[in-house]
Amino acid sequence: MTLTEQFFSQLPEDNLAALRRTDALWRSLRLGILPVPTVVRESAEPLEKIDWDVVICGGTLGILLGAALAQRGWRVVVLERGSLRGRDQEWNISRRELDVFVSLGLLTSAELEQAIATEYNPARIRFFGGDEVWVKDVLNIGVDPVYLLETLKQKFLQAGGQLFEQTPFAGAIVHSNGAIVQAGEQRFSTRLVLDAMGHFSPIVQQARQGKTPDAVCLVVGSCATGFPPNETGDLLVSFTPIQNQCQYFWEAFPARDGRTTYLFTYVDTHRDRPSLEALFEDYLRLMPDYQGVEFNQIQPKRALFGFFPCYRNSPLKPNWDRILPIGDSSGSQSPLSFGGFGAMVRHLQRLTIGIDQALQADVCDRRALSQLQPYQPNLSVTWLFQRTMSVRMDQKIAPNQINNTLSSVFQGMATLGDPVLKPFLQDVVQFPALFKTLTKTALTRPQVVVSVIPQVGIPALASWMRHYVTLATYAALYPLSQPLIAPWLTTLSPTARYYSQRWLDAFKYGSGGDYGE
């Protein structure tokens, strides 16, 4: 019996089956045999009657936006294929990012505090052979998904929203003035469809037409007891060189019922990449070295596993009128992050206001909706970082090159202070911080820059330069655009106001200007 089988034998039987189902999906992706569904069709006929303003497909994170829109008076339906209930595993985020729930009126301050299950400080960053860097107040809050989603669900229902559970999305027909959503045995007519079904949404699969992801983040982990007492966390740690053409990274933090640990790695979709079960075996094999605990002392509460595909063509632009991808469906997170809750929260206020204005102006065509998922150069520049943290199957680099590069970069950021380090750790890249980091690394560790160029390749570097220059442009335009455009917004027509506000949002979020607000 493998370590993985021994570990999963202590959990309900369906856990190992779920791991192997996810592995089968990962294998199909590597082999390029995932079927491309056809779930969206178009009709030139207008709808005679429209019952809803918004239908949200996918309730786990869709309920966040659903509650915000329902409280603004819109007729909103949320469709969930199962039961709308949060998972038992906490969502980790920084406290500042949670303020949006209070500012949007979704939670009171007391409710927000009750939603916080755990809090720890500080967190460690360290790479094999390098020095430790410690930070405070970054991804150190564990939110209770069960309480949060139940509270938001009740707020949603109290505001007049309707929730349909056990109602899986089956298809949509886009008409000139709305859309029909088929879910379960029911049909819903609506002005706008929001796709919150995640990375493997059938709508997204149809839109991408089987395109292979440009990168994938593989993640395995668990919440367990039996570890030595430790009230600190790890944000990004490695303690091994490259193995199996993968650089393994680790994350750990205290949880309500134990300690959560993850192993993750950045890869491409080469058919010889490891399975999640093989990665889980390495996770358990290396755990004694990582946490100072013998395998037989670990008492698992939950197993965690998954993979997150990333596309350079992100955020995903709408392919049809009346349908907008949001959250993981849109790919609106950097290729370095797991996306999910944190990415949804970051864009919650922007999407709430933007969708509200789109409905007011009745601009739900493809061109208008694409303004809600704009190009973000601060996300695009992170693709180069993703390449420096991964190695191709046919590539030969020094075993510790990735560790040495990252150690040099993060040591440099640490000396530049929290204003440089913290935003990057929270998936927000800003031009001044990036410029300072790259300049310091080039001046103090030129050998690191020289070693990275052949690793990432000239084409990737050239593409990155374009995004880097655009990021600098956005950083300059954002503070200029606010005083020039914002005072005139109230004098514009609803349509002109919608497009103007989207430009302001693009500069703000694309430059990382939303950080700290």
What is the predicted function of each stretch?
Residues 83-124:
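N-terminal FAD cofactor-binding segment of flavoenzymes
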Residues 158-289, 348:
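Predominantly flavin-linked oxidoreductase catalytic cores and closely associated redox partners
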Residues 55, 59, 65-90:
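Glycine-rich FAD pyrophosphate-binding loop
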Residues 44-59:
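Beta1/beta-strand and adjacent pyrophosphate-binding region of the FAD-binding site
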Residues 256, 272-389:
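FAD/FMN-dependent oxidoreductases across multiple families
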Residues 133-155, 202, 270-275:
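Short beta-strand to alpha-helix junction loop
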Residues 2, 20-32, 353-517:
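C-terminal helical "tail/cap" subdomain of flavin- and related membrane-associated enzymes
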Residues 95-104, 122, 130-148:
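Dinucleotide-binding Rossmann-like beta1-alpha1 core, especially the glycine-rich loop
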